[in-house]
């Protein structure tokens, strides 16, 4: 499950908005926020976000033991 707080934190560190991330994964901002709320991203979307946000350990964010919303 996705640790949304860590994802949002990394987005803030890299100064990326939801709209920016929507472009990165090729979706509308509405779809991006819906996917984040539902904690559902496909592997291509995760890969794109990891690359754009320069995430060193994606497991901590995208495969967290506890889900945060």
Language model: regions and residue ranges:
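Residues within the helices of the helix-turn-helix
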Residues: 8, 19, 47
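Short, charged recognition helix plus adjacent turn
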Residues: 9-15, 23, 34, 59-69
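Residue-level signal for the short linker/turn that defines the boundary of a DNA-recognition helix
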Residues: 15-16, 44
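Recognition helix of helix-turn-helix/homeodomain-like DNA-binding domains
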Residues: 26-41
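DNA major-groove recognition helix of helix-turn-helix/homeodomain DNA-binding modules
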Residues: 44-60
């Amino acid at each position: 499950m996705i640790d949304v707080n860590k994802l949002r934190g990394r987005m803030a560190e890299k100064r990326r908005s939801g709209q920016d991330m929507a472009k990165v994964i090729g979706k509308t901002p509405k779809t991006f926020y819906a996917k984040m709320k539902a904690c559902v991203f496909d592997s291509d979307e995760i890969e794109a976000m990891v690359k754009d946000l320069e995430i060193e350990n994606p497991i901590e964010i995208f495969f967290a033991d506890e889900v945060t919303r």
